[in-house]
């Protein structure tokens, strides 16, 4: 929004031209989202406490989590508000990339909000019925997938980039829709499964978003894209604003979500942030790279799949409890140790993912 004002004022004072640079606006976007979260966080937490919107803890969960019962939840609204305000202020609102991610954040955030509402207000520990949640996620993801396929403006927008291989970028054709669907829905649910300990999900989300900010900048720059053998995506640079807004809002939220948490993000945060990461990966054509950099999310999801599959097929469980972070809790690891070690793994995987841009 302020881009247009700065563009108008540039004719009177050339210094306003600095707002035309994506990097400058990205820094402002990060700072805006961060400061908003830090400023509004205590007010939101107090409001949630007043409304008695507290975390519902299942009786079959780890005993150490019983003390978390009643901790304010739905803090993901703070993250979403920070991202939306920051992007609307500093982003180029003529960019379809920006609106696609905002739509995904809003739609999946609404699904998560309904789920949280049923849990904390109506006291239904199961929340939104699983089939309805999956149906709503599928509708939103398919809508985006079809739109991106129909509105593709260059061949690079529907290619699959394969890490470690320089010129292997096959055209996907109609399979593009299938890939987009599974990337968005899968990423959304993976982050949701990871959000089980204080700060466990938000820090890897911040790391992956920061990495995608760099990738989006490179993909939107014709010379860097050519040098690194990435598909050149005109206008993708505006995704940098979205990514840094997620980083800023996420760090601000972590201030209150770090152990012991004062607030949880709830499904309104985890479902929307996961879907946003999947959408950004799709837009910059790095779905495979998301699997690498978001390895912690993948690990958590696979642990659940293996646990359920093993129990149904063999009647035996592989882990003491799934997702896998609960397995380590039941082994006696203190919660902060599990969290920080998963953060370290996430940092390593993000750096590995970025290294693949050059290792071709």
UniProtKB/Swiss-Prot annotation:
GO cellular component: plasma membrane
One Gene Ontology term of the molecular function aspect: phospho-N-acetylmuramoyl-pentapeptide-transferase activity
Key words, A-Z: Cell cycle, Cell division, Cell inner membrane, Cell membrane, Cell shape, Cell wall biogenesis/degradation, Magnesium, Membrane, Metal-binding, Peptidoglycan synthesis, Transferase, Transmembrane, Transmembrane helix
Pathway: Cell wall biogenesis; peptidoglycan biosynthesis
Keyword Cell division: yes
Transmembrane segments: 26-46, 73-93, 97-117, 132-152, 168-188, 199-219, 236-256, 263-283, 288-308, 338-358
Top EC class of this enzyme: transferase
Topology in the lipid bilayer: Multi-pass membrane protein
Disulfide bond sites: none
Cofactor(s) required, per the database record: Mg(2+)
GO biological process: cell division; cell wall organization; peptidoglycan biosynthetic process; regulation of cell shape
Source organism superkingdom: Bacteria
Compartment annotation: Cell inner membrane
Record's catalysed reaction(s): UDP-N-acetyl-alpha-D-muramoyl-L-alanyl-gamma-D-glutamyl-meso-2,6-diaminopimeloyl-D-alanyl-D-alanine + di-trans,octa-cis-undecaprenyl phosphate = di-trans,octa-cis-undecaprenyl diphospho-N-acetyl-alpha-D-muramoyl-L-alanyl-D-glutamyl-meso-2,6-diaminopimeloyl-D-alanyl-D-alanine + UMP
EC number: 2.7.8.13
UniProt similarity note: Belongs to the glycosyltransferase 4 family. MraY subfamily.
Function: Catalyzes the initial step of the lipid cycle reactions in the biosynthesis of the cell wall peptidoglycan: transfers peptidoglycan precursor phospho-MurNAc-pentapeptide from UDP-MurNAc-pentapeptide onto the lipid carrier undecaprenyl phosphate, yielding undecaprenyl-pyrophosphoryl-MurNAc-pentapeptide, known as lipid I.
Protein name stated in the entry: Phospho-N-acetylmuramoyl-pentapeptide-transferase
